Amino acid sequence: MESGTASAAKYGREQAWQLLAEWTESESLRKHARAVEICVSACGVAEADRLRLDSEEREKLLELYATTALLHDFDYERHPTLDEHPFVGVRELERLGWPTELRTAILGHAQYSGVPRVTHVDKALFACDELAGFLTACALVKPTKAIAEVEVAGVRKKMKDKAFARGVNREDVIQGAAELGVDLDAHIGFCLEAMKKRAGEIGL
């Protein structure tokens, strides 16, 4: 019988990254996955602190948040239609034995899936997905293309500009913060700080 440690290792961050890389050649999609991972992982740290988890439980929670974020769009490059994404990917994850919590969160991040967001990781993924993409776009229009120059006020101003980053659903950003039970400006600032701390990992 496989031990819990061995099983966890089989579905850890390294394995998630390998699967993402196998299915996704686009560097921008890989960077998006990493940006979402950074934001969702920061939410995971805050949740672990709130729950006062011991080291073992904390590690498990953070692994779940990181892997869920990395894999949320792993099938998008091959299956970008609403009929296929994220359903094809989730079926593959089920075949490979990835945890139910991860698969449910990935289904839930797509509004059209009909899967409700119940757990904190479900809500964190939805709240960070579109926002991470928007924050990246805000950084890339800066002369230095550095997220260090992006501030909350500037992000809110850009959100009102419908011509900017048209692909980002502003309503999802607003709804995501509401579902997490946090103020929108606070959530934007929280994700900005997380991305600024690890900017080198995503080329910003």
Where are these regions (language model features)?
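Residue-identity detector for glutamine
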Residues: 15-18, 111, 175
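Divalent metal-dependent phosphate-bond-processing catalytic cores, especially two-metal-ion Mg2+/Mn2+ enzymes
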Residues: 25-30, 36-57, 71, 122-204
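Divalent metal-dependent catalytic cores for phosphoryl transfer on phosphate-bearing substrates
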Residues: 58-162
